[in-house]
Amino acid sequence: MIDAGYFAKRVQPRPDCLPASGVLEICSVSECLSPGADDWIASWRHNGLGWFNRVSDAVGVIPEKRRDEYRLFAYRIHPEVFRGRERSALPLPDDVHPEPLPAGFRSIGFDSASRSSVGGLSLECSPLSCNAMASEMPVNEHCLFPTLDAAIAGAVRFAAEQPEPGDYYVVEVLEGGPRIEPSLSANAERAST
C-alpha cells in the first residue's frame, strides 16, 4: 500500500435506502454520501488523487466554525488499477507525496472506488455505498471492506460488472480520531501559514 494523502469529511449515518443493517456510517473514499468541505477544490492544495499531502491543508480548507463537524482520514492506495478483467500498475501522479502518517491514525477498513477518467481529479464512487452493494458483500460498520483481500475481490467484481463506470482502485482508510479537535485546527492553521 502506498501513502496517498489526507482528507476531512462530514461522515453521514447509513441512509435508510442502504439495506445493510450492520453499517452505522459511511466512511467511503467517495464524497457522494459523506462530503468534504464546500469548495475544497478551489484552494488547489490537493494532489493528483484529490487528497492533501499535508494534514494542515486537509484541515485548512474547512471553515473554522465548522471544523467540529468533520473527521480526518488518511488514505493508502493499492499499487494496481482494476480495469475490466485486467490489472495494471497504478500510475501514481507525480505530486502524491504526503507527509508521514502522524501517530494516532488507525485502519478502519478498505474501499474499492471508481474513477471514470484517467485525468479526473479524484476517485468518484464506492459501489458499497453509492450502489448499495454493501447489502451483498462483507462490510464493517463504516461501510468498508474489513480486509485488503475482500477489497481486492470487490475491485475485481466492480471492474467487471461496472456498477459505476471506470477503473477501480483499492484504498485503505485510516482515521485520525473521532473529530477534528480545536487544538488540531489551530495547529493546522499555524502550520499552513
Language-model features: locations:
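Short aromatic-glycine-(Arg/Gly/Cys) micro-motifs in beta-strand/loop hairpins
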Residues: 1-49, 66, 75, 94-141, ...
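Short, mixed-charge low-complexity intrinsically disordered segments
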Residues: 43-95, 140-144, 148-193
